[in-house]
Each structure stands twice: as structure tokens, then as C-alpha cells.
Amino acid sequence: MSELTKRLITGAVLIAVVALVAWIDNFFLTWAFFGVIYLFAFYEALGLFDMKDQNSLYFWAAALWIVAAFYPNPDDLFFIALMIFAGYEAYTQDRNFKKFLPFLYPTASFLFLLSLYHDFGMEALIWLVIVVALTDIGAYFNGKAFGKHPFCKTSPKKTWEGVIGGVLIATIVGSYYALMLVDLPYAIVISFLTSVAAVFGDLFESYLKRRAGVKDSGNILPGHGGVLDRVDGYLFAAPAMVVLLRGLL
């Protein structure tokens, strides 16, 4: 089976699963779906941070996600976890602050992702998916067609033309969809800034992979690499959208 065939089959399965979860639109199903993705992403992040021997962190990651199902503001839990970790470090004088990295990335972002659904509903999640997906797709095709100027050294294949084209397409389509949720000025601002955040979410994961000396964050998704390779844009875009919706509406 060719790499392209694997990529297409995996992509089709992922789209079908996401569509089913969106159609059912049940909080605990969505929480469980995000939870599975989160734990795989957490595992991959440990690899990128060179911490695969820290098995005890999985327990705390799972415990935090279980609490998030019942706590009214899931993103608050990141700050509570930070205080607990700081207290533990002070008490034990362990001084291994690296242990907190996977709770900063990707944990905090997944808590914001759950908060987006909890506070603003499935419509907002679909808005997020539209913006992030079109930012990525638009950047790819515009970069192929018009790309001449490299965006940055962290991701050599990205071009300014591709990034700008992707952000513009995501902003236009995202704003049109968002009219069912917010007024046009808010739709434009939120779509634009969320798209920009997605660009840097992708860039940050590329930076982590470059530092770790790996091409992909994992290999669980045939033809696509790891979970983080698929959700990197969402990990910056979700917090951005939550903050913007809370601040502007």
C-alpha cells in the first residue's frame, strides 16, 4: 500500500469519526474523544521532551482529565495543577521542573479545547475546525502555487505566500460560518487571530520535533505520523478562540 493510499484512508477514517462525534453532540462522548487524543498526544510530547521514562506522569494526566469532566471551567485546572506542582517541587526540592512541560503542552491546550465545547457548544468547535483546517490546507496549496519567500528557518517548507493565503482563506470562510454565532466584525477578528494562532501552533510543534531530531511526533496514524502532527494547530488555536470569545462577547 502506497503512502498516499495510507494517508487517504487514515484521513477518511478520522473525518468520519469527527463527523460522528459532532453529529451526536454529547458532552461525555466529546470529553472521551478528546481524552483519547489527549493521552496519545501526552505520550508523544513526553518523547519530544525526552521524558519517556516518566511513567508516573500518565496517572496525573488521566486524573486531571477525569476531573475536567466534572469541573465547570476545565481550563482553570491548568493553574491548579501548576500550583500543586510548584508546591510539590518546593516540598521535595526535586528541582526537576521539566516534569511540568507536558502539562503545559499539550495539556493546557486540551483543557481549553474542552472549555470551548463546554462554554460555546459544538458550533464553536466546528468553527475552530474550519479555521484550522483551512489555514493548513490553504497554506499548502497557496505555497505550492505561489510560494517564493521562506517563512522561517524552523519550518523551511513554509512560505510567506502560503501562510498569508491560508490565513486569508480561513478568515473568509470561518467568518461566513461564524455569522450564525456572532456579528460580522467579531467573526472576522476571531477567525483571523485564531488562524494566526494555528500557524504558530504548527510552527511550535515543528520546533519541538527539530530539537528532538525526529520527522514525526509518532507513527500511530498511518501516512500522517503522530497525533500531535494532526492537532498541533488546534493546540494554539483553541486557547486563542476561547480567550477571544470570552473577551469580545
Language-model segments: what does each one mean?
Residues 211-234:
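Interfacial loop-to-transmembrane junctions
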Residues 196-200, 230-235:
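Hydrophobic transmembrane alpha-helical segments of multi-pass transport and channel proteins
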Residues 134-144, 198-210:
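Short helical (or helix-break) motifs at transmembrane helix termini and adjacent helical loops
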